[in-house]
Amino acid sequence: MRCGSLCRFLWLWSCLPYIEAMPIQRVQDDTKTLIKTIITRINDISPPQGVCSRPRVAGLDFIPRVQSVRTLSGMDQILATYQQILTSLQSRSVVQIANDLANLRALLRLLASAKSCPVPRARGSDTIKGLGNVLRASVHSTEVVALSRLKAALQDMLRQLDRNPGC
């Protein structure tokens, strides 16, 4: 039993020189490209008929306001919140954006691990209290505000990635 484990370990050890790690710059470039793709998808979604693109709606405090986030874990936390909001909207137009946010979060975790940062952990669903009530009252307004703020947050993240964010 021990000999078999040792043989497998030595065989894997001999393969290590041939395994190439993904360059961090390539991961960062993929992250920037995905952010630009998500921004393009948001731009392609036109607001529903009769809804202002910059509405002033009360009760949408759970949607993060635009603020500069300088850490990878902070970016992951904001994206987790937006992903949860978009998933709750159950709108066909935002399904792909929600999936893209999941992929973007995975790329940010890969960047964090390449920098030897602790793996970012998003907080639980308590960040979006009362979302169901707001969705029943104003689904379209919530979607417009969420996409508008997400777009601004992604543009800020794009700038921060150029500055090499910390953990």
Swiss-Prot record:
The GO terms describing molecular function are: hormone activity; peptide hormone receptor binding
- Top-level taxon in the UniProt lineage: Eukaryota
Q: Which InterPro entries match?
A: 4_helix_cytokine-like_core, Leptin
Q: Report the transmembrane regions from the record.
A: none
Q: Name one GO cellular component term.
A: extracellular space
* Cleavable signal peptide: 1-21
Tagged with keyword Secreted:
yes
Q: Which cysteines are joined by disulfide bonds?
A: C117-C167
Give compartment(s): Secreted
Any single GO BP term: regulation of cytokine production involved in inflammatory response
Keywords, in A-Z order: Disulfide bond, Obesity, Secreted, Signal
Its chief place of residence is secreted
Give the function comment from the record: Key player in the regulation of energy balance and body weight control. Once released into the circulation, has central and peripheral effects by binding LEPR, found in many tissues, which results in the activation of several major signaling pathways. In the hypothalamus, acts as an appetite-regulating factor that induces a decrease in food intake and an increase in energy consumption by inducing anorexinogenic factors and suppressing orexigenic neuropeptides, also regulates bone mass and secretion of hypothalamo-pituitary-adrenal hormones.
UniProt family annotation: Belongs to the leptin family.
- The entry's protein name is Leptin
The species is: Halichoerus grypus (Gray seal)
